Regions:
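Nucleotide donor/acceptor-binding cores
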Residues: 2-4, 73
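Secreted/periplasmic proteins that engage bacterial cell-wall peptidoglycan
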Residues: 29
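Glycine-rich beta-alpha loop elements in corrinoid/cobalamin-binding modules
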Residues: 33, 37-44, 49-127
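Intrinsic structural disorder
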Residues: 1, 12, 41-43
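Short glycine-rich His-centered loop
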Residues: 4-26
Length: 127
């Protein structure tokens, strides 16, 4: 087990949401919610890192491998956006990365999905 308590993950949704437009026109939103949560958790003396797959330009497989390599006690998929419905369009990317992670690690890393979509539709999110 890693010494890392929590890994906050922004999954790579830009390609799924914007397709080829993402090559030239899609902005990368800073992981504001991850940074706020990280600060709170570090105040509780937990070790925390942020993996911003959007900024790293990772695909789902690369993101899942990076999470597996870090082997946190808890992997938190932070699926938010500044626009209220933004988390819904990013959910498929989060699901793809989660599924790849579970296939690599055989479900050994505990995961949590958070965001407005997951909060509003928890059962559908789990399906």
């Amino acid at each position: 087990m890693s010494n890392l308590d929590v890994l906050l993950i922004t999954p790579p949704s830009r390609i799924d949401v914007y397709q080829t437009l993402s090559n030239d026109y899609a902005a990368i939103e800073p992981p504001v919610w991850s940074m706020l949560i990280a600060r709170y958790l570090t105040n509780l003396n937990l070790s925390v890192e942020i993996l911003d797959a959007e900024a790293e330009n990772f695909n789902h497989e690369q993101t899942a491998k990076k999470i597996a390599d870090k082997n946190p006690r808890l992997a938190v998929f932070v699926i938010y956006g500044q626009q209220p419905s933004a988390s819904t369009q990013c959910m498929p990317a989060g699901a793809k990365t989660c599924n790849k992670l579970n296939s690599i690690t055989k479900g050994e890393i505990k995961t949590l999905v958070m965001g407005t979509h997951a909060s509003a539709l928890p059962k559908r999110t789990l399906e």
